[in-house]
Amino acid sequence: SNVKAVADAVDTVGGVKIYVQDAEIKYLNNYIKEYNEKFNQNIPDVTEAGMQQLNGGQAVAYSRIRYLEGGDFARTRRQQNVVSQMFQQIRKLDKDEQNKVFSDLYETVDTDMSKSELMNMADVMIKYNLSDMGGFPYKKSGKNLGSKGDCVIPCDLEENVIMLHKKVYGDKNYQPSETVKDYSSKIVNETGLTKDDATDYGDK
């Protein structure tokens, strides 16, 4: 199981430090219960808010929380937080220990990558700081559009494209094309959401 593999990897590096909010505890413990039942484990509940040293099972449970403000966006941020903290721990290990973590992961997860490809990628990944893991669109909101279902809406597309060019290319004076402007207007007309309607999901 990929889930169990990640939990085992977190345990191998000594757990991760995560700030758990009071509102998250109920859902976190529900997922811990599911984890224990599925994998025949006895992972303890998290009983208080604040900075916590989570073991593998607790960290996986934390990363599954979605039924709070922010929904899937907030869940993605929790997953990124766990991965970031895990890599901080991996950097503290010596080379042989690092290789063992990734080798064990390879043996227990489903992937199309070869083992050598994974190990080479791991060598590169541990050199990077994963603190800024925001995604496009930067300013957005969620809305149900009937037959189209739940959608992520850029607020607005033109504004997001300007931000993208500034962030990726360092272009502070980028002017969107007429095509981008046209699509941006169409999205506003169809959804009713403008750049002033972006929801703060706490990501970057």
Task: Please tell me what each predicted stretch does.
Residues 108-204:
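C-terminal solvent-exposed extensions
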Residues 1-2, 51-55, 71-79, 93-97, ...:
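Extracytoplasmic/periplasmic, Sec-exported soluble proteins
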